[in-house]
Amino acid sequence: FHPDFSGRENIYFNASIFGLTRKEIDERLNKIIEFSELEGYIDNPVRTYSSGMYMRLAFSVAINVDADILLIDEILSVGDQHFQEKCYKKIEDLKAQGKTIVIVTHGMDTVNRFCTRAVWLHQGKIKMDGDAESVTKVYLEETA
């Protein structure tokens, strides 16, 4: 996001980077804002947003651009419990639609809840690659 742009301007800016036309963004704008729950702040510069607000807006844009692959990098670690659960439900919906979701996390519960495959990286190298349950089990044993 551009820190001096408002949340609304950043929606247009970022959605256009993902290839959406102005008309497509116009059609999705209210849905994006509503999901983010930032209605009262959407016209403020994002530099005034907390990390949780920033994450809400980023996630809301990402899930509304119809990408085939969604990359979630520790993004849900800053949101409140209500919004996290809302995001988790959306992730489950996207997974059910056959979307590919790549989650970067240190949360093994998150890995086991959403992933069929897990890759454990250690010092920039793949330490283990396999089904989520097996990888998280070994990870927890070795890092305890």
Regions found by a protein language model. Name each.
Residues 12, 16, 24-41, 58:
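Conserved ABC ATPase "signature" region
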Residues 45-52:
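Conserved ABC ATPase signature
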Residues 84-97:
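Helical segment within the ABC ATPase nucleotide-binding domain
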Residues 129-130:
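ABC ATPase "signature
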Residues 111-113:
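A short, surface-exposed alpha-helical micro-motif characterized by mixed small hydrophobic
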